[in-house]
């Protein structure tokens, strides 16, 4: 019974990751990164990456709400 519950838990985690692990880092399609620091905004990172804000947001699959909640320490794709 415990093995069955463990398998269900593992399946749940894998499904959850499939839906939440979709940024460029997990996809392996990025060659240049920017790590978010305290106080950073999407605009700050786009400027550091030398891309437009729109390009930065599309590359990282971000919307305006996600840019309000930049995750400190997270790697964001520049290209």
Swiss-Prot record:
Organism: Dictyostelium discoideum (Social amoeba)
Disulfide bonds: none
Domain LysM: 32-78
Keyword Cytoplasm assigned: no
GO cellular component, one term: extracellular region
Compartments where found: Secreted
Annotated transmembrane regions: none
Name used for this protein in its record: Putative uncharacterized protein DDB_G0289443
